[in-house]
């Protein structure tokens, strides 16, 4: 089954987080755990947004300005939104 490692995305400028369904069946090292998404700290227009199984294991060089929590495969309403991106996974 695919393993989802993270998301690369361009952050938008809207102040609310749209609902994002990553996958119906997400498998990986911590499927039952709460995940976090890290935003680059430089403000609107940032191009890096990374989602990881481990809330503390963000991509090197990204300063985490805020966190949005989601459980399982659904992202909850939160602090930042309006992004396009793609899921990084392996087969």
Q: PLM features: what roles do these ranges have?
A:
Residues 1-26, 84-88:
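Beta-rich globular "head" domains
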Residues 28-38:
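Surface-exposed loop/edge segments in extracytoplasmic proteins
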Residues 46-55:
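Exposed aromatic-hydrophobic patches
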Residues 16-17, 28-30, 72-74:
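Short, surface-exposed beta-strand/loop "edge" segments at domain boundaries and coil↔beta transitions
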Residues 5-7, 55-75:
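Noncatalytic modules at the cell exterior or secretory-pathway interfaces
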Residues 1-2, 68-91:
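C-terminal interaction-tip segments
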Residues 37-46:
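Short proline/glycine- and polar residue-rich coil/turn motifs
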